[in-house]
Swiss-Prot record:
Part of the 30S ribosomal subunit. It holds the Pfam family Ribosomal_S10. Belongs to the universal ribosomal protein uS10 family. One of its GO terms (biological process) is translation. Keywords: Ribonucleoprotein, Ribosomal protein. GO terms for cellular component: small ribosomal subunit. This is Small ribosomal subunit protein uS10. HAMAP family: Ribosomal_uS10. Gene3D superfamilies: Ribosomal protein S10 domain (3.30.70.600). GO terms for molecular function: structural constituent of ribosome; tRNA binding. SMART domains: Ribosomal_S10.
Length: 104
């Protein structure tokens, strides 16, 4: 029985993210299932200003730290065999995955 899956991937490291997307693409090509995506979603930019005080005399200034979160979206029409293949993917620690079954 085939069902639709929506896979959300996000990471701060683009290379790791693209590596996981490529593994999913290879599984889709090998098994012959329909795959839509990967759809690149807008990059979320998080900026944290930190007030920095020097020791002794001197001027006060702000440091700005930044983190970018890259996201991808993939839709698959999968069966149990494909789902087993997806669970065996080696995912780096800095890549987060969310898989949901779509209805309709």
């Amino acid at each position: 029985m085939a069902f639709k899956l929506r896979i959300w991937l996000w990471s701060t490291n683009v290379r790791s993210l693209e590596n996981v997307v490529e593994q999913i693409r290879n599984i889709a090509n090998k098994t012959g299932i329909r795959m839509r995506g990967p759809v690149p979603l807008p990059v979320k930019r998080l900026e944290v200003p930190v007030f920095r005080l020097p020791h002794g005399e001197g001027s006060k200034y702000w440091e700005h730290w930044e983190m970018k979160v890259h996201k991808r979206l993939i839709d698959l029409e999968a069966d149990e065999r494909v789902l087993r293949h997806l669970m065996r993917i080696k995912v780096p620690e800095d890549v987060y995955i969310e898989i949901k079954q779509m209805t309709g």
